[in-house]
């Protein structure tokens, strides 16, 4: 497959030590060589790096001092010739270098176009391409490991084996239908077909079992911190983040809006949401914050309910407990450095079997226990991203669910005595759905939509 030559800045825009302009295409080396003063890049070996200068051909002025990496097809990310120009970081010089390259007849790359070419040229499949963006967006080491495993093809191999099993079954069915007179062909009975289809459904179910944890590792746990004003919600946020993101004062109602922050808790990414203290108030701005707090609480995957150890439970406290019933929540009884006024037995009763943890955030006590409780709640205390192939992408989860239902329909049809040639339809559809995960059976419009979500230069 032949494409034109493209270029883009591959590093984040802004001031920094180094910025990289990436060029990919059959004539990438020749195009860059025109504006490079140093060695003749067309003569140098592949996978080498060379010092020189970028020159404006119109003025013969040196624009940048650079190091240029030459990587020749097919041993490159896109399977095309790739040139990477390492410039000094900054906006002006790197943009000037890019403009000089574009002036040589090179096109500015679209978002994700380098990765798209890697997919279209057969270097990676679609699930591996999506893992590239997951790696970029990873919030924890665990999420990074899951993305790397997918980039290395773990999920692709699982899907490939399932599709091969289905294909062999379909071929067996086809032979039985077209050549029933052949004595050396094993008869495809309903029992054999049920056994093979049940195996596929079981394998799909095993992969889907990892989806909840996989999605958490990829997207994080939306965690709302709720409680009455001045019980220590912002202090809890700051303790988990380990830096002062929220204003902490003795004045009730200081947090009037929703503060969001990602934090790594024992490999689990939490999207922490510090909400405005929930109480009845006449302050218009604070009241808006309270309403937003209630909305965020309803949308959260996990709720941290904070109450004050040094104060008796109020009707507002009890109302919060009622509001979180049916959700995953942990109760934090804060300010244990002060004299006790709260009824702990009542707190435990309201917690209804959920964890209750006592803390003194001002003395940094109880945070380790809270972090362990969060990991226990979602991962039973352990996250084994090394040996488990997690499925974390919502598109993949949806397709696997759809494939599981379709193969289930096939099994039901077999059990009801539907002719084998009719069962072929559901088996073929299952094979096609699984192929959409890896991109073997996917529409071009979906490919364009997926890669448009990538950053420019990737």
Curated annotation (Swiss-Prot):
Belongs to the TRAFAC class TrmE-Era-EngA-EngB-Septin-like GTPase superfamily. TrmE GTPase family. Its main location: cytoplasm. GTP binds at residues 230-235, 249-255, 274-277. GO terms for molecular function: GTP binding; GTPase activity; metal ion binding. Its EC number is 3.6.-.-. It is found in: Cytoplasm. PANTHER family: TRNA MODIFICATION GTPASE GTPBP3, TRNA MODIFICATION GTPASE GTPBP3, MITOCHONDRIAL. Mg(2+) binds at residues 234, 255. GO terms for biological process: tRNA methylation; tRNA wobble uridine modification. Its cofactor is K(+). It comes from Bacillus thuringiensis (strain Al Hakam). Residues 220-379 form the TrmE-type G domain. The keyword Metal-binding applies. Exhibits a very high intrinsic GTPase hydrolysis rate. Involved in the addition of a carboxymethylaminomethyl (cmnm) group at the wobble position (U34) of certain tRNAs, forming tRNA-cmnm(5)s(2)U34. Homodimer. Heterotetramer of two MnmE and two MnmG subunits. CDD domains: trmE, TrmE_N. Binds 1 potassium ion per subunit. InterPro entries: G_TrmE, GTP-bd, GTP-bd_TrmE_N, GTPase_MnmE, MnmE_dom2, MnmE_helical, P-loop_NTPase, Small_GTP-bd. (6S)-5-formyl-5,6,7,8-tetrahydrofolate binds at residues 22, 84, 123, 458. K(+) binds at residues 230, 249, 251, 254. Coiled coil: none annotated. One of its GO terms (cellular component) is cytosol. The keyword tRNA processing applies. Keywords: Cytoplasm, GTP-binding, Hydrolase, Magnesium, Metal-binding, Nucleotide-binding, Potassium, tRNA processing. PROSITE patterns: G_TRME. This is tRNA modification GTPase MnmE.
């Amino acid at each position: 497959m032949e494409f034109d030559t493209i270029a883009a800045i591959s590093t984040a825009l802004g001031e920094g030590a180094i910025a990289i302009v990436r060029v990919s295409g059959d004539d990438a080396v020749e195009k860059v060589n025109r504006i490079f003063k140093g060695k003749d890049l067309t003569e140098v070996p592949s996978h080498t790096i060379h010092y020189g200068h970028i020159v404006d051909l119109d003025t013969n002025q040196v624009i940048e001092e650079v190091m240029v990496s030459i990587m020749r097809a097919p041993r490159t990310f896109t399977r095309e010739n790739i040139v990477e120009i390492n410039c000094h970081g900054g906006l002006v010089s790197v943009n000037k270098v890019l403009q000089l390259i574009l002036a040589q007849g090179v096109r500015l790359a679209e978002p994700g176009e380098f990765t798209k070419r890697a997919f279209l040229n057969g270097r990676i499949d679609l699930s591996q391409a999506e893992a590239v963006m997951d790696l970029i967006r990873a919030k924890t080491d665990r999420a990074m490991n899951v993305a790397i495993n997918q980039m290395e093809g773990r999920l692709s191999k699982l899907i490939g084996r399932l599709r091969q099993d289905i294909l062999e079954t379909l071929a067996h069915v086809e032979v039985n239908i077209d050549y029933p007179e052949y004595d050396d062909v094993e008869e495809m009975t309903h029992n054999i077909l049920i056994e093979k289809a049940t195996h596929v459904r079981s394998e799909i179910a095993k992969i889907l079992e990892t989806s909840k944890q996989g999605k958490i590792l990829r997207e994080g746990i939306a965690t709302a911190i709720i409680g009455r004003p001045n019980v220590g919600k912002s202090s809890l946020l700051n303790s988990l983040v380990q830096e002062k993101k929220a204003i902490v004062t003795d004045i009730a109602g200081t947090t009037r809006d929703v503060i969001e922050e990602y934090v790594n808790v024992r490999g689990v990414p939490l999207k922490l949401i510090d909400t405005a203290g929930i109480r009845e108030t006449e302050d218009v701005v604070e009241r808006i914050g309270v309403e937003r707090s209630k909305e965020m609480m309803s949308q959260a995957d996990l709720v941290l309910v904070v109450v004050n150890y040094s104060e008796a439970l109020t009707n507002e406290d009890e109302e919060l407990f009622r509001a979180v019933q049916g959700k995953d929540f942990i109760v934090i009884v804060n300010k244990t450095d002060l004299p006790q006024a709260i009824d702990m037995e009542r707190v435990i009763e309201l917690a209804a079997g959920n964890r209750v943890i006592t803390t003194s955030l001002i003395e940094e006590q109880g945070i380790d226990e809270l972090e362990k409780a969060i990991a226990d709640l979602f991962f039973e205390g352990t996250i084994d991203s090394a040996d488990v192939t997690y499925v974390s992408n919502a598109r993949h989860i949806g397709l696997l669910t759809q494939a599981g239902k379709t193969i289930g329909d096939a099994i039901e049809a077999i059990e009801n005595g539907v002719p084998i040639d009719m069962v072929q339809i559901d088996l073929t559809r299952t094979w096609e759905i699984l192929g959409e995960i890896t991109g073997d059976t996917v529409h071009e419009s979906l490919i364009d939509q997926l890669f448009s979500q990538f950053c420019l230069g990737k």
